[in-house]
Amino acid sequence: MSADRHVRQPAMPCAASACIGADVAGLALAPATEPSLFVAANVADGIASTIGDIRDFATVRDAIARHRPQVIIHLAAQPLVSKSFADPIETFATNALGTAHVLEAARLTPDVKAVVCITTDKVYRDQDWVWGYREQDPLGGKDPYSASKACAELVAASYRATLAERGNGVLISNARGGNIIGGGDWSADRIVPDFVRAVTGRLPISLRNPGAVRPWQHVMALVHGYLVLAARLVAGDRAAADNWNFGPSDDAARNVQDLVERLGASWTRPEIIYASGSFPETRFLHLESTKARSLLSWTPPLSFAETVDLTASWYRDFSANPADASQITLRQIEHYRDAVRTHGTR
């Protein structure tokens, strides 16, 4: 199913720094990194942007009431495992209570028809197995980040089951994505931004868990899935108001070392230093996404190699010409659309 018909609906992503689309209003914190894709690509020029914190309910309520969106894509989060250990209170307040703020404001705003809550592949209880996690597997979370996102899932489930019908009847879904890579991320303690900083600064890269297996996935594949899901909700498909895994094909579940080696082959290979991790991490993490493939007709068209090469290409081109961030991004969006048209699902 194409998301193109949906993109013209009035929409409001919470965490607008992460969104592409049309007719968009956004609520997000001020950019926290330098550089920032939101600034470099002049994202604010194309949307109605509100700088605010979802931990403040009045801010969320007022922004949603002012813009009256039909669709809310809730991306706002404290997304870093490392920071969740340093500041667990902020992590739980943002990820769990912030989700409640978004959903409470959504159900009290008559125009809102759909909310897609973006969580993570880390919401599942760690079974230390090689199989992909399915939507019905138990939630869990040993580290504060994973636990806070599992809490957000329960908040959304409560609103979906009972509170939405006591408001405007908004349809609510949870979308659980794989490990996201792609251009424009400069966060700390993430493998691709760390790789880019190592290459551009001519520094070594430190790998904490080179054997950890993750479902690497391009950000555009996830945006594609979120828009397809949102389109179903806006159309009134109550069956879509559920939990959904959006994971890559099996070949994309590779370890950290594989990712770094492919990035190096696509650009430049920095010196690698192996270091012990300062916090526990899951050894194997993979999503089973048959449900989205079968019922939403969604499958990402990019292989692991294509995903990594496209990511390296974005950063390489940006490093050569930072002023061209918007055009680099638009070219890659068109590349992804061409891949969908050419390959369809696979």
Residue ranges and their predicted role:
Residues 1-177, 181, 335-336:
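N-terminal Rossmann-like NAD(P)+-binding domain of SDR-like oxidoreductases, especially those catalyzing
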Residues 36-39, 127-130, 185-188, 219-220, ...:
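Short aromatic-enriched loop/helix-cap "lid" or pocket-rim segments at secondary-structure transitions
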Residues 151, 155-159, 195, 259, ...:
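Hydrophobic alpha-helix immediately C-terminal to the catalytic Tyr-X-X-X-Lys motif of short-chain
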Residues 130, 141-148, 188, 192, ...:
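The catalytic Tyr-centered alpha-helix of NAD(P)H-dependent dehydrogenases
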Residues 57-58, 70, 82, 89, ...:
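Residues in well-ordered alpha-helical elements
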Residues 9-26, 52, 179, 199-346:
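C-terminal substrate-binding subdomain of Rossmann-fold SDR/epimerase-dehydratase oxidoreductases
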